[in-house]
Amino acid sequence: MGDDLITTDGTTLLGADDKAGVAIIMSMVEYICQNRDFKHGDICIAFTPDEEVGRGTENFDVKRFGADYAYTVDGGRIDEFSFENFNAYKADVTITGKSYHPGDSKGKMVNALTLGRQFDTMLGDNKRPEATEHKEGFYHLHHMEGDVSTTKMTYILRDHDMDNMHDMIHTMQLAASYLNQVNHGHYIDIDFTLQYKNMIEVINKTPDIVYKVKQAMINIGLEPIASPIRGGTDGANLSFMGLPCPNLGTGGYNYHGPYEFCSINSMKKGVKLLLELIKEA
């Protein structure tokens, strides 16, 4: 109650992820330009395209950027900040079957679509995005296409703990091996690609940047909440590139769907938070 919201008409995305973050940063810059007596340390600002497809830091030059540490403004609630995120892998599953006329296929046909369905079932319903929360990891089958002869499936694997991630990879390998064995051939191949890692491995070595966020939030009247991200940010990759980079909120909610909205009041608090942080820079 009493908040001002930005929404769409419900038929499209709002794009607050991450237009809201850009607006907060530029509002901070505007304030600095209009208030020349505002004292602050040296600051560096960058905007990265293609974050949503995992390529936001592909050409980012950390040395040229010139900062000792940074914060992405790409989260949700304005009183939340994050220095943990998922470890992320992509799994490309290729299934090569044997196609025969269905009327004369007994003992001969190996249906790649059927193997794909069986493979996915073996991963378990309790390890899917719609069944997990908090730090629970998941397999997400987000693309599948094919026919009897060839079927391709693309998964994303997510977990905050790398040991759990390795177990998930092993489970997929065991499922493929089992189906190959019971069908007396080699039909299923899996290629795994590391996408990003949990930034906490880096942030734990620089705890002062976490303390600065907590103190800045308290100073502007927020009660800080450290919340692990069930996703990733450019900050995860930047952290492993030598630029420790926790994530701050934007006041946006329900990202990536038609019910997305953003709180103007929260965005204003986001500007205050950045100004408080750079005073301590």
Features from the language model and the residues they span:
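Acidic-enriched catalytic cores of C-N bond-cleaving enzymes acting on peptides and small amides
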Residues: 83-84, 105-144, 163-189
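Phosphate/diphosphate-binding glycine-rich loops and adjacent basic-rich segments that engage nucleotide
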Residues: 70-105, 110-114
